[in-house]
A protein has these predicted regions:
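A general structural signal for short secondary-structure boundary/capping elements
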Residues: 64-66, 92-99, 112-113, 122-124, ...
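Sec/Tat signal peptide C-region and signal peptidase I cleavage site
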Residues: 16-22
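Positively charged n-region of N-terminal signal peptides that target proteins for export
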Residues: 1-5
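N-terminal mature ectodomain segment of secretory-pathway/periplasmic proteins
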Residues: 26-103, 129-138
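Tryptophan-centric aromatic hotspots in well-structured domains and transmembrane helices
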Residues: 41, 66-68, 115-116, 165, ...
């Protein structure tokens, strides 16, 4: 069970950006996403980042380049057996890919992508997700309070349907803390972490450090090598 947790990494998510964007969106989700650069996301040609996990005395890193306009994904990391793996694929053609890509790489990509840009996903997914503003609540850490915005996904479809993300949002509309509740029976059932280490790359804002617990065990998720490439440019803009 622990090995599965480390390989699939903490969270399961139902869909990826690009679905149902023309439908009605949650106003509170839009307000949060705008703080992270939603209005300028159309300028972004590619996003680069390395997902780093520290859990149960083990460290895992996965590097990605994602082109949101085309759905092209490039992965540099290891497979479940620890062997080096590099692959590039189109999400629209996922059915053509090997089992390793379909069963390991793409679920990991979706997971890591939600960690790095969840404020956008909460907005993009809001036509199908139940987004509720629950007002000011005490932070799970017990220190201070913030607005609680709950994002609950449908019990049907996706890698792990029925998940709920509780976002604790400050007065500046930045997420300060979040609690993830898994909808199914897979582990972990509960992940609770900070959102800190804020950096900006071009027009986008990223939280690059998350510290907390996964089913009670200490966990840290961090991002390095974060950068964006804007349309019409060949240069990467590093987060700082």
């Amino acid at each position: 069970m622990l090995s599965r947790l480390i390989v699939l990494v903490l969270l399961g998510v139902p869909v990826l950006a690009g679905t149902s964007r023309s439908q009605m969106h949650s106003p509170i989700a839009e307000q949060i996403a705008k703080t992270y650069g939603l209005d300028s996301f159309g300028q972004v040609e590619a996003v680069r980042y390395t997902f780093n996990l520290e859990l149960a005395g083990k460290n895992i890193s996965r590097s990605w380049v994602w082109e949101p306009k085309t759905g092209r994904v490039s992965f540099d990391g290891k497979d479940k057996d620890g062997k080096p793996l590099k692959v590039t694929y189109l999400q629209s053609d996922l059915y053509k890919e090997s089992d390793v890509v379909k069963d390991e790489v793409d679920p990991a990509f979706v997971n890591d992508n939600y960690w790095i840009i969840f404020p956008f996903h909460a907005y993009w997914d809001s036509p199908g997700a139940d987004v509720q503003d629950k007002g000011m609540q005490q932070l799970p850490s017990g220190k201070g309070s913030a607005k609680l915005v709950s994002v609950k996904y449908s019990s049907k479809g996706g890698y792990t349907p029925g998940d709920t993300w509780d976002l604790y949002v400050g007065n500046d509309n930045r997420i300060e803390y979040f609690v993830y509740h898994r909808g199914g029976e897979k582990k972990p059932q509960l992940v609770s972490t900070t959102w800190e280490g804020y950096k900006k790359a071009g027009p986008l804002l990223f939280s690059t450090d998350h510290r907390g617990t996964a089913d009670g065990a200490p966990v840290r998720v961090s991002f390095s090598n974060v950068a964006v490439k804007l349309a019409g440019s060949d240069s990467w803009i590093d987060a700082q």
